[in-house]
Amino acid sequence: MPIQSLAPRRLYRQIADQLRGLIQAGEFAVGTRLPPERDLAQQLGVSRPSVREALIALEVEGLVSVRMGSGLEVIAREPAASAPRVDTAFGPFETLLARQLLEAELAAQAALHGLPDQLQDLQHALALMAADVAAGLAPVRGDRLFHLGVAQAAGHGPLVRTVAALFDERDNALFEQLGQHFETLRSWQLALAEHRAVLAAILAGDAPAARAAMHHHLQQSHDRLAASVAAPGADAALPAAAAAAAAAAAATAAAAAPGSRRRPLRPTPLLHPPT
């Protein structure tokens, strides 16, 4: 069964379906490795981020293992019975693009129309993020409050629900698995700095700067998932205190509420650069 090129429609699901079919047909036997991400993208005629989403979906299903130094190994011929269903209509990269298009303009409007109490809410959300990052936890609670707060400060009530729906796509199994691989202490430190730039522009009433800062932040969020991650050890320059905070957080992981995604963060990515 040869690999076939695909039309650009919900690509990650099409790619996952085709690779799943090849695995089930025995073209890729259990214990063997799939072609590198780069080669799969070339054979399928699609982008590497779309291939990555598909591979993560297959990992969620229990068909493949995506491990540091081990490549993409087939570990089962059929999806695990206990595996969560990956049924999101849109992949993480498509969702991030939609957020970028929407939230950049909302940030500009927030700079022009934000009320004092709304701006205080943004500062509170940022403080929550900073506290979680300092504790070595993924700061999704404060992150969500911040992005919804920007929409509220923009004065567009219906779009608050739209932003919430897009943000909450992060709770699906595909986005969660991507985060397990690529979210690190360093990536959230960078994201925190980007949020601070957005807030500074909003507080200054500088709409163009707020628009640019939010656009930059969501582009960087996309790139941190889509681009090749740094080789192991690239984050070795993290301050010792930050690494210690992550280790301490790991030791007290039970304190994080189940399902909250405030999981302990690693100092470095789980994976080698995708190939």
What are these regions (language model features)?
Residues 13-14, 49, 93, 97, ...:
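A generic "alpha-helical surface" signal
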Residues 1-108, 112, 233-235, 242-245, ...:
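Short linear motifs at protein or domain termini
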Residues 44, 154-155, 229:
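A broad structural signal for alpha-helix termini and local helix breaks/kinks
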Residues 169-275:
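C-terminal all-alpha effector/ligand-binding and dimerization domain
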Residues 4, 11, 22, 28, ...:
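Short leucine-rich amphipathic alpha-helices used at interfaces
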Residues 99-102, 107-177, 194-200, 209-221:
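Conserved amphipathic alpha-helical segments that form helical-bundle/coiled-coil interaction surfaces
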Residues 24, 155, 203-204:
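Residues at helix-coil transition
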Residues 27, 63, 137, 206-207:
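Residue-level recognition of short, well-ordered coil/turn positions
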